[in-house]
Amino acid sequence: MDSELEDLCSYVNEKIGNIKKILSIRNLGQDPALKTTLSKIGDEIIAVNELLNKFELEIQYQEQTNSSLKELCESLREECEDVEHLKEHVPPHLPQVTATQSLVHKPEPDPKESDKAEEPGLPKKPPREQRIIKEMQFITMDEFSDVPAYMKSRLTYCQINDIIKEINKAVVSKYKIMHQPKASMSSVKRNLYQRFINEETKDTKGHHFIVEADIKEFTALKVDKRFYVIMHILRHCHRLSEVRGGGLTRYVIT
């Protein structure tokens, strides 16, 4: 109780002291000699107040600018991380950049060599017609996105295109043997050639196809459940069709 009374007395005394100071300042303001000085001080206070308002607005602007710069830095950091991720995960099946032939300096033809070339000699054999081996096209990101989730499960875009790369390897290996003259074949290739012929049907005529035996012969792929899932996806993406018969499934490149 005594403590509260002392606090109240202290508070009242403080207020009385403030009133006395105000009254003394008021009396000073009535002095004609000080009115001009007080007026100037008032003008200075107004000017300082306006300056403080400008400082406050500038501080708000700087805070907004700082916030925008932080957001920009964060956005740039994320973009840099995305670029680094792309650099580190470039699909291996993408074509490599090569120098074009137009940039390669070709030496001027030697007139003497041209004269020699024009001299009649032994007739040359006509060049053998280059046979084109049809390869499977890689799937695009849009096509991969359209594959139902239940079908692709945890398979990635790159994993599917890696399988396509191996399938193309098997196709090229098979049809290089098919296009090779039989006289130059080894016994192993001759046996493979005969198997290729036996596997053909009227439905595969004029088309490039492989069977599981070709996958095992020319690649290191395992013909397992994952392989069949990917073949199902490739059929969904119209990269191949299946021709069955004689206990074989022929994967026709479309």
From Swiss-Prot:
Coiled coil (residue ranges): 56-90
One GO CC annotation: meiotic spindle
Annotated positions of the Phosphothreonine modification: T156
CDD domains found in the cross-reference section: SKA1_N
Pfam families, sorted: SKA1
Compartment(s) where it occurs, according to its Swiss-Prot or TrEMBL record: Cytoplasm, Cytoskeleton, Spindle; Chromosome, Centromere, Kinetochore; Cytoplasm, Cytoskeleton, Microtubule organizing center, Centrosome
Motif (Slightly degenerated SXLP motif): 92-95
Compositional bias per record (Basic and acidic residues), positions renumbered to this chain: 105-129
GO molecular function annotation: microtubule binding
Family annotation (PANTHER family): SPINDLE AND KINETOCHORE-ASSOCIATED PROTEIN 1
Subunit composition and interactions: Component of the SKA complex, composed of SKA1, SKA2 and SKA3. The SKA complex is a homodimer organized around a central W-shaped coiled-coil structure, formed by the interacting domains of SKA1, SKA2, and SKA3, each end of the 'W' is extended further by the C-terminal microtubule-binding domains of SKA1 and SKA3; the complex forms extended structures on microtubules. Interacts (via SXLP motif) with MAPRE1 (via C-terminus); the interaction is direct and stabilizes the kinetochore-microtubule attachment of the SKA1 complex.
Family: Belongs to the SKA1 family.
Reported function: Component of the SKA complex, a microtubule plus end-binding complex of the outer kinetochore that stabilizes spindle microtubule-kinetochore attachments, promotes alignment of chromosomes at the mitotic spindle equator (chromosome congression) and assists suppression of the spindle assembly checkpoint. Kinetochores, consisting of a centromere-associated inner segment and a microtubule-contacting outer segment, play a crucial role in chromosome segregation by mediating the physical connection between centromeric DNA and spindle microtubules.
Name of the protein in question: SKA complex subunit 1
Organism placement in taxonomy: Eukaryota, Metazoa, Chordata, Craniata, Vertebrata
